[in-house]
Amino acid sequence: MSSELSEGELSHTSSSSSFVPVDQRQLQDAIQIINEEKRFNQSVLEYINKTAPADVGNNYHIISVFGSQSTGKSTLLNKLFNTNFDVMDESNRQQTTKGIWLAFSPVVSTTSGHTSSKSNILVMDVEGTDGRERGEDQDFERKAALFALSTSEILIINIWETQVGLYQGANMGLLKTVFEVNLSLFGKSKLEKHDDHKVLLLIVIRDYVGVTPVESLAKTFTQDLINMWASLAKPAELEHLQFADFFDVDFHALNHKVLQPKEFSEGINKLGDRLVVGDELFKPEYHHQVPIDGWVMYAGNCWEQIETNKDLDLPTQQILVAQFKCDEIVENVFQEFLKKFEQLFGEPQAEPDYEQIGALFSDLRNDTLEDYDISASKYNKSVYEQKRVKLISLVNEKFKEVFDFYAKELSSTMLKKFHSDVVALKGKNFAASVKELSTGLIASIVTTLGLISLQGDLSSNEVTTALSKDIADIVSKQQVIELNSIVNRAVKKLTNSLSKSIQFELGDPNENTWDTVLQQFNSLSQEVLTKYDGDFGLGTTDEQNKQALDRFQFKSWTSFYESMHKLISKEKLLVLLQDRFDDVFRYDENGLPKLYLNEADLEKTFTESKQHALKVLPILTIAKLSDGSEIVPEIDIFDHKLREKYLGVADEDSDDEDDDEHCFAEIVTEQEKSEVLAKFKKEVDAKYIETKRSIVQHITQIPYYIYLVIVFLGWNEFMAIIRNPLLFSLALLLGASVYILYKLNLLKPAIVVAQRTFDETVAMGKEKLREILIDDHETQGRNLGKIAGKNPSAPAEEYSDNIELDDM
């Protein structure tokens, strides 16, 4: 401490109740930052700027000392940090330090002498506890200890060795109260900001005699701190926080200052080494991470919060007056705001410019708050800020009305476009595309509404929640549509392929026909099931996917049933039987038309043809497998409830039809089968008669002797042909044609064709002649019938046929 400073120019006692004035010559002296009247000194920053090097910035450390009165706290600081805190007059034990003092440490005592720290060290000397001067009044002790704990990086707890393990002697009661209040005031910041800030509790054990190891003393004291922390009354949300989340603990022992002065000095120097040489005790998480001027402001705010905390003090009359006046100002300012608000936002814009609206929001709110600040800032700061928050809430509520209106309009417009976009997907990459569209929609709306949200004060969470629900409804409905579309397309594809398979099998039915058709059906069904494997790529639930597969299964079996009945109706069955009959009856194995020369051949072929046709009748009237079992669907397609569920078909006569038995495998009923057989027999019998008639006509031929007569009588004509070149050429061509037909084995078919052509020509000639000569066919037919002795009531058609047969 400078020897040039005179007694009259300085206050060398920390017990002074007035603030020490800052003077350029007092660079090593302390400044009282909190006096006995609990007032914070506003000159602290000025003191630091004059005592510490320029541009301190963040390069500083704050160390404070805490402990019982007259335990040598100030002496420890002076010896270690070379400060000038007043110490106790050993001839008279009384309180020396009053309030809280702050001093700049120019150098630190180390084993190598006085060492300058790389960082600027500021030391706080806190008024001792348990002093007789304050007696039972522990209010300032609690507040001073709490202040030191809240503003320091390292809190030195100065105790004697004999105090370790004691409760009151080690100030455990006071520490518990201080920790409890510190937790309630500053604990929430650790949750809200995820703050990892800690304070190092450096326990300096004084008058250490060396009998008990320091490690044992440290273990005892640390366990006492942990037990004390566990017994704290913590807020519910802070119950999980541990002592180690807030504090680190370290220990250092010092010998007796009077009895062992050399060892005491060595202990001081070793502690200095730990601070500045090894940089062992300062850690980044202890620092408050604010510049020195910010720390001064922080310290002032901390003291104000500690001093005015409701748990420690009651509202004063000044606060009550401030509350009344601030409420009055809020009401006046808000009414003025409402007038401007109505002028600006009374009528909504048809095509809103959200950026412009957001700017109007901000300007109007800032003007309103500025009016309030001018009138209310002179009152109690806490009340002023509280009522300012209330005014902001009132203003934001009015803005929220406009915000909600435009949010609703914007959401409605965007949802319509979203719906159109979702429908346009047509199931292509549906789940991924819908996710992209919905994410883009919400992001677009949030971005747009962010322009009128007053920098996020007006939350769009309600809008996005409702929007997400609407999006989910749209997507859910479209999912059902797309799911049904996929099922219907799959059923349609299966139906087409199955129909082709059935048609192919109808070309040549056999006992394995339905095995082949069923195998094709199962293959097509399995192809669909394998393709989707329970997931249709629509983002639908497992339950919806299962229902879709059940619907596909029901519709596929229904399609199987309908395809069989569509392709094998009784009309088509009759045509099929006729075609099979004709294949054998009219054509040979080479596909050439047959010419019957005798009735025996005709009857044999007729029997074979009819058997060939009727062989497939049992196969095509009921769907049976080669093992004789009928095809049975895996699901009852005739169940009325299932038909209504999967097909939307409500059978009105379902109650009347409950007793009817439906057989999936039955394609043609027995009655229909009888009708088909009757018609088939009639048709084939007609073909048989027609063919037999042509044989009879063919057999009736000219006698052979007639040809001799023709040769004899037509010899002259024959010679005339030979002598005529034209006629001779025609005769050669005719002979060559007959020879070629003979060699190609086509002579008989050619004769048949010629004969039938001639017969048809004659028949047509007779018909035309009859139409000319006879006007009333039926009358003439009856007359002819009477002449022939027929029944007059017989149909005219029968008589007409008889006439034709007789004529032929």
From Swiss-Prot:
Entry keyword Endoplasmic reticulum: yes
CC per GO annotation: endoplasmic reticulum membrane
Cytoplasmic side: 1-701, 747-808
Enzyme Commission number(s) of this protein: 3.6.5.-
Top-rank lineage group of the source organism: Eukaryota
Residue spans, topological domain Lumenal: 723-725
Molecular function terms from GO: GTP binding; GTPase activity
InterPro entries referenced in this protein's UniProt entry, alphabetically: G_GB1_RHD3_dom (IPR030386), P-loop_NTPase (IPR027417), RHD3/Sey1 (IPR008803), Sey1/RHD3-like_3HB (IPR046758)
Protein's name according to its UniProt entry: Protein SEY1
Species of provenance: Candida tropicalis (strain ATCC MYA-3404 / T1)
Gene that this sequence comes from: SEY1
